Amino acid sequence: MEVKIIDIGEDYVRLVIKGEGHTYLNLLQHYLVEDEDVIVARYNIPHPLIGEPEIYIKTSGVDPLEAVKRANEKIIAACNTLLEQL
């Protein structure tokens, strides 16, 4: 996975996440939307074969990259919980 920052401000970020598809981006969006500091989290994959997946996050003033980190920590915790139950 390669992450590239396309645009960033105090309360928003637009990222390209190469090598990923709907599986990861939908999960990331899900956990971002659950964050009370996140106003908008949406992603787009322009074309499934050649498009680079993009995600846009807007927050209520907190660092948007911190929101992405928190969402990824929740994904890791959910995966660890699942692995413990197997």
Swiss-Prot record:
Mark the transmembrane ranges: none
Q: What is its EC number?
A: 2.7.7.6
Question: Into which EC class is this enzyme placed?
Answer: transferase
Q: Where in the cell is it found?
A: Cytoplasm
What is the reaction catalyzed?
A: RNA(n) + a ribonucleoside 5'-triphosphate = RNA(n+1) + diphosphate
Pfam families in the record, alphabetically?
RNA_pol_L_2
**InterPro entries in alphabetical order:** RBP11-like, RBP11-like_dimer, RNA_pol_Rpb11_13-16kDa_CS, Rpo11-like
Q: Which domain of life is it from?
A: Archaea
What GO molecular functions are on record for this protein? DNA binding; DNA-directed RNA polymerase activity; protein dimerization activity
Query: Would the keyword DNA repair turn up in this protein's UniProt record?
Result: no
Q: Name one GO cellular component term.
A: cytoplasm
Q: What keywords sit in the KW lines? A: Cytoplasm, DNA-directed RNA polymerase, Nucleotidyltransferase, Transcription, Transferase
Q: Which function does this protein serve?
A: DNA-dependent RNA polymerase (RNAP) catalyzes the transcription of DNA into RNA using the four ribonucleoside triphosphates as substrates.
PANTHER family, per the entry: DNA-DIRECTED RNA POLYMERASE I,II,III, DNA-DIRECTED RNA POLYMERASES I AND III SUBUNIT RPAC2
* Subunit text: Part of the RNA polymerase complex.
Give the family from UniProt. Belongs to the archaeal Rpo11/eukaryotic RPB11/RPC19 RNA polymerase subunit family.
This protein is called: DNA-directed RNA polymerase subunit Rpo11
Organism from which the protein derives: Archaeoglobus fulgidus (strain ATCC 49558 / DSM 4304 / JCM 9628 / NBRC 100126 / VC-16)
Q: What is the lineage of its organism?
A: Archaea, Methanobacteriati, Methanobacteriota, Archaeoglobi, Archaeoglobales
